[in-house]
Design a protein with these regions (language model features):
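PHD-type zinc finger and closely related Cys/His-rich zinc-binding mini-domains in nuclear regulators
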Residues: 258-325
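Charged, glycine-rich intrinsically disordered N-terminal tails and low-complexity linkers that flank
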Residues: 1-107, 156-180, 248-249
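C-terminal helix/juxtamembrane-tail motif
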Residues: 223-224, 228-267, 323-325
Length: 325
């Protein structure tokens, strides 16, 4: 029987983890990015923030070379510089966002209880994990989770409430009604949080200097069942193989993937992420591979190295389309 040995957890894949073990690991990692053990337990696990990227790789039948940057991130070989302006801003604003959310919840709900959490590991699939920003419960709604986002949006002098002029890419506006884009990575992230924590709703809360936006999103079992199939396949195809032969780790070089220290700055506006590796699209980088290109159809940005763009390709084409388009 195949075994999983992952950060001190060992046993047949079919056995899973006990409820007691899941709770102990959660308690031991409260504080999340301020807790070293949280980082340790994430390594080698597909966390909910990567669910969308993993699913896209499987559905689009990507080659191992294209999967490599994402796999490297999941295994903990590479990471994004936490001091990048957008990420630093998000960390600094999260306590304020949390306070604003809690005030809103207390006004419209009874017996509200908030609880900080660490990492939740799927008891049946210990290679899946999620870290909601907050665990929430109340007498009227039962048990849920909350996820906070703090995008860097400039102050708007035209809008008196949540700014519609510079809407974050993860929100959609349909006849004046805002909602989370169901095709965005954040939707997969919170569906994963609900599935792994065993809760049935998530308050998606967006904090900006122009006001706040909140949407309660319910668990979608059909969506998650489909997503989970992709996650299982990715684990069996790539992560198990990497644990066995360490081919990605052994092939590591200094410039692939790019060292984040070559970054001079990140654009002061919206921060874009490469759909393939989920890495940040950076400005003013020194190496050609670290540069990026925008698809002329879907308008998403991709790292040159992730889509195999060469100087010849750029010279010969007036337009460029990503593999999906």
């Amino acid at each position: 029987m195949q075994k999983l040995i992952l950060n001190g957890l060992e046993g047949p894949l079919s056995d899973g983890l006990s409820t007691e073990t899941v709770e102990k690991l959660n308690d031991a990692t409260v504080g999340q990015n301020r807790n070293e053990q949280w980082y340790v337990l994430r390594k080698g696990r597909i966390t909910s923030s990567n669910f969308h990227s993993v699913s896209c790789k499987i559905k689009h039948n990507k080659s191992k070379d294209v999967v490599r940057p994402l796999l490297s991130n999941i295994m903990g070989y590479t990471s994004v510089n936490p001091n990048l302006k957008a990420l630093k801003y998000g960390r600094e604003m999260e306590p304020i966002a949390k306070e604003s959310y809690q005030l809103c919840m207390k006004k419209g709900h009874t017996n509200v209880v908030f609880k900080n959490c660490g990492i939740f590991i799927d008891s049946c699939r210990p290679y899946l994990a999620a870290s909601p920003d907050l665990i929430v419960s109340c007498s009227c709604c039962g048990d849920g989770v909350s996820e906070f986002k703090c995008p860097m949006i400039p102050k708007c002098d035209l809008c008196t409430d949540f700014c519609l002029c510079k809407l974050p890419v993860f929100l959609r506006n349909e006849d004046g009604i805002l909602s989370l884009n169901r095709n965005h990575a954040y939707f997969a992230q919170i569906q994963g949080q609900m599935a792994i924590t065993g809760r049935f709703w998530c308050d998606f809360f967006v904090y900006t200097c122009n006001g706040n936006f909140s949407e309660r999103i319910e668990f979608d079992k059909d969506y998650y069942d489909d997503l989970q199939c992709d996650l299982d396949r990715f684990f069996n195809l790539y992560i198990l193989a990497e644990f066995k032969n360490r081919s990605v780790e052994n092939s590591f070089t200094e410039d692939e993937p790019m060292d984040v220290d070559v970054v001079k700055n990140v654009n002061d506006g919206n921060v874009f992420f490469c759909p393939i590796c989920k890495g940040i699209i950076l400005d003013d980088v020194k190496t050609f591979k670290a540069q990026s290109v925008q698809c002329d159809k879907c308008h998403l940005w991709f790292h040159f190295s992730c889509v195999h763009v060469t100087k010849t390709v750029l010279k010969d084409k007036k337009e460029w389309f990503c593999p999906h388009c």
